[in-house]
A protein has these predicted regions:
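Membrane-spanning alpha-helical segments of multipass transporters and channels
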Residues: 2-3, 106, 110-278
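Long, highly hydrophobic alpha-helical transmembrane signal-anchor segments
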Residues: 17-33, 69-75, 80, 222-229, ...
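Membrane-helix interfacial "entry" motifs
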Residues: 26, 30, 34, 38, ...
Length: 278
């Protein structure tokens, strides 16, 4: 009797999740929502890490080579720092746009090729048979779920968190870069930032399993973690007030840190010979 109970408990159960929309009830797939969120989170993570580190390296090199002494004679230090952050950020956005255009082009070409293949009589029977297979049904189900996503909302919020997260971390790293005298000293400042971003990255992936859990909700409001965590939660549906509060806190903190980093930058870029410390 005990063995039968254990076997019943271990019986696999398929649970269909349902998402309510303005048009009514629609079946949803958690895996697709998670995949979309994880993809966007990964983009933000690698963009902020790569181009934020580039800002820090650029500031450090200019200070080490004393190039910055010539620059500050023409522009204010805060303007120089802001221009550097915006310039490198625009380079990154341009690169992302190129990748996006190439991806759309590849998908379009693949669609045209598959459309031409459908008119080939020799493949008509094979295509007709394949359409009856479970894989075809799964593809249609995936397309249906993707079409039910708030794509416009996801796109707008992705851009906002993309820009806000970059401005926040790039401002901090620019201030750190101005405080060091040797590029090798940047490691002690880069490590805490890397740890925070890794925590935000893994917190985002954990939130995919429980997007409305306490960790996911609280990390959505913390500016250092919200860009990664919120992009995981948005495909599942997030209240408007949470989105508005999260974006407001992110940009407010980014502006405050930009101002503080500007103060550090103004003093640090012309300070030599002192060992930086945390």
């Amino acid at each position: 009797a005990l063995n039968e109970i254990v076997e019943d408990v271990q019986t696999p159960v398929e649970v269909a999740t349902v998402r309510w929309t303005d048009e009514g009830e629609r079946e949803s797939m958690t895996e697709i929502f998670s995949a979309v969120g994880m993809g966007l989170t990964t983009l933000i993570y690698f963009f902020v890490m790569s181009y934020g580190a580039m800002v820090m390296q650029s500031v450090t090199e200019e200070k080490t080579n004393r190039i910055v002494e010539l620059m500050v004679s023409s522009v204010k230090p805060f303007q120089l720092m802001t221009g550097k952050i915006i310039g490198i950020g625009l380079v990154g956005i341009t690169q992302m746009l190129i990748w996006g255009i190439l991806l759309v082009a590849i998908i379009s070409i693949a669609g045209v090729v598959s459309g031409v293949a459908m008119f080939d009589p020799s493949q008509a029977a094979a295509i007709s048979a394949a359409s009856q297979m479970p894989d075809a049904d799964l593809s249609m189900q995936i397309l249906s779920v993707v079409s039910s996503l708030p794509l416009a909302e996801i796109a707008v919020l992705f851009v906002l968190y993309f820009i806000g997260g970059y401005l926040l971390y790039a401002s901090v790293l620019a201030g750190f870069g101005a405080a060091v005298n040797d590029p090798q000293d940047t490691q002690q400042f880069m490590m805490p930032i890397a740890v925070i971003m890794l925590f935000a990255f893994y917190a985002g992936f954990y939130s995919a399993m429980n997007p409305d859990g306490p960790l996911a909700v609280w990390c959505s409001f913390i500016p250092l973690t919200s860009p990664m965590v919120m992009m995981i939660r948005i495909p599942f549906g997030v209240p408007l007030w949470q989105e508005a509060l999260s974006v407001t806190l992110l940009f407010g903190t980014a502006l405050a840190l930009s101002y503080l980093s500007g103060k550090i930058y103004r003093v640090g870029i012309l300070m030599y010979g002192k060992k930086p410390s945390l």
